[in-house]
Amino acid sequence: MICDTLQHLTRYKGLCKNLDTAIDYLLTHDPASLPLGRTEVDGEEVFINTMDATLHSDHGYHPEYHKKYADLQLDITGSEGWGFTTNPGREIGDFTGDCGFQDSASVVT
C-alpha cells in the first residue's frame, strides 16, 4: 500500500507496470473530477475507486489490507492522515473481495 500525495507520484514509477499505468493516468486526469465509484483504466488490472470517505480519528483505527491488489491511497483534499502497523492483529469480520480489516492495538499515526 502506498499512501502519498499527487505531487510525489513519480517517485513510485518503475516499481510495477500496473502501478506505472495508474500513475500515468492520474498525472493526465484530474483525480478530483473523477466520479465517485469505479473508473476502469485497464480493466481488472488497473482501476480507480473514488470515494468521499468519512474520516476518523486515530483512535479505534482498523488497518486495511489487500490480498490481490496493490493499493495507492491519495488524499485529494489534504485532510486525511494514515496509520500503519508492523504487528497486525486478528481479522475483523469476513474477508470478502480484496479488502479486509484487522484489529490492532499497535497502529502508529
Predicted regions and their residues:
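A short mixed-secondary-structure module that forms the rim of ligand-binding clefts
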Residues: 55, 59-63, 67-71
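Generic secondary-structure boundary/loop-capping signal
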Residues: 38, 60-62, 92, 98
